[in-house]
Regions:
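Catalytic-loop region of hydrolases
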Residues: 2-13, 42, 51-124
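N-terminal cap/lid subdomain of alpha/beta-hydrolase-fold enzymes
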Residues: 113-178
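Conserved acidic catalytic loop of the alpha/beta-hydrolase fold
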Residues: 184, 188, 195-214
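Conserved hydrolase catalytic core segment
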Residues: 212-248
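Alpha/beta-hydrolase-fold enzymes
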Residues: 236-315
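Short beta-strand/loop motif that positions the catalytic acidic residue
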Residues: 360-362
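Conserved alpha/beta-hydrolase "acid-adjacent" motif
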Residues: 367-373
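Catalytic active-site module of serine/aspartate enzymes centered on a nucleophile-bearing elbow/loop
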Residues: 384-418
Length: 418
């Protein structure tokens, strides 16, 4: 398979120097040739576009190790004093972290939630959130699946969910503050890839003493990261269940993402609102929209679908920011498990050698990552000799069905955990 074209990163910062925001260095050994990395992890971007830090200017000499504090939305976002076994979101400082690009985060911070069986006393399950999600899987977006007696049974398993690298809910990302400048990274935050996000998950798991996982599962971007978590440590995960996630990003999705990033670059937060509206149209299905909105108008004559999209756009503005959204979308567009591994089949042979099982879950009517893309991954896994199965969620909800179809998800995950 060909590597996926990446979105060109907009490295200029309007109104102030990117250098004033820079808080990280570049690891020359890991970076190697920027031109070589640009041809694989960042195809489609010129080396001159990427810069020595891929979207940021390195700190001045002598300031290569600067600790960054987090810029939380509120003090309640992360309770760093909480017991990690109590189900509260906690933060963990994980030290120096080198990205694929060679850029360095001097002090990676991870926010996570752990529920259920204590670490070290039983099997652990990793749940990975999607694009704008958080570590609060058990208390929020997957709550119907996690808990005593649920399919992800906290009486039998420990359930851990970490906020993704580059996000804004406690883990290092664009809103993290540099203690020297007192300002957030913003656009100067270095580019991250899905593999960087997977490696950050392992950094946290290692720090917590979790060496093996019974299951890694996630939807959309979370499914992509779950795949890379498995490939990063073949043999450490028994089963991987990526939901609505292919082996590589599809070109239609890259095109949609590019439009969103262009909107943000040109219009800032107004662009983010429009980007979210566009994204929502890819998360649902034609059937869902027709059933909910056909023939409906608001009191002022506005079509109800338009009012709905405006509402969704405004909702995201209340809890997100343009730099974080850009960082996460760009990371998603680097997804390709076959990159620098000889293709998808060769990559999946690494998992087959350790007996890792794979369940690829497609969603009926998903226009973002179609069922054909998930089937293609399972065909590659079968060719690689993996114990692989395809399952499908039947729904009118489109891509976001992995956030609402609880009964079908329960059936699929029950099978995966056998």
């Amino acid at each position: 398979m060909k590597s996926t074209p990446a979105i060109r990163w907009i490295s200029e910062v309007r109104g102030e120097s990117a250098r004033s925001e820079a808080t990280a260095g570049v690891d020359s050994k890991r970076a190697g040739s920027l031109a070589g990395l640009g041809a694989s992890a960042f195809p489609g971007s010129k080396t001159s576009d990427l810069g020595t830090g891929f979207g940021f200017v390195p700190a001045d000499p002598g300031v290569s190790t600067i600790r960054a504090d987090l810029g939380f939305r509120s003090l309640n976002d992360v309770d760093s004093s909480s017991d990690p076994q109590t189900g509260k979101i906690v933060s963990r400082w994980l030290g120096r972290f080198v990205l694929e690009s060679g850029a360095i985060l001097p002090d990676l911070v991870a926010a996570y939630r752990h529920d259920g069986v204590p670490i070290g006393d039983g099997r652990q399950i990793l749940v990975v959130h999607a694009l704008t999600g958080s570590a609060d899987a058990a208390g929020d977006w997957w709550a119907p699946l996690i808990g005593p007696g649920q399919v992800l049974d906290t009486d039998k398993f420990g359930i851990i969910c970490m906020n993704l690298l580059g996000s804004r809910y406690g883990t290092s990302g664009p809103i993290s503050r540099n203690v020297v400048t007192g300002k957030p990274y913003g656009r100067a935050f270095p580019r991250v890839t899905v593999r960087d996000q997977a490696r950050a998950q392992w950094r946290l798991l290692d720090a917590l003493g979790i060496g093996k996982l019974a299951l890694a599962v996630g939807g959309s971007l979370g499914g992509m990261v779950a795949l890379e978590v498995a490939l990063e440590r073949p043999g450490e995960i028994s089963r991987v269940v990526p939901i609505a996630a292919p082996s590589r990003i599809g070109q239609l999705a890259v095109g949609w993402d590019n439009i969103q990033l262009e909107l943000i670059d040109r219009l800032g937060m107004d662009g983010l609102e429009l980007a979210r509206q566009l994204a929502i149209t890819t998360y649902r299905s034609e059937i869902d929209f027709e059933q909910r909105f056909a023939g409906r108008v608001e009191a002022d004559g506005t079509p109800s679908i338009v009012s709905y999209l405006h509402h969704q756009g405004r909702k995201l503005l209340e809890r997100f920011d343009e730099d974080t959204y850009r960082t996460l979308v760009w990371a998603m567009d680097t997804h390709d498990i076959g990159r620098d591994r000889g293709g998808a089949v060769a990559a999946l042979r690494r998992l087959a050698a350790y007996g890792t099982r794979l369940t690829g879950v497609g969603i009926e009517g998903d226009i973002l990552y179609g069922t054909n893309q998930v089937r293609e991954m399972i065909e590659a896994a079968t060719a690689a000799g993996m114990d692989a199965a395809y399952r499908e969620i039947h729904s009118t909800k489109g891509h976001d069905a992995f956030l609402v179809e609880w009964d079908q998800l329960t059936t699929i995950l029950t099978e995966a955990l056998k």
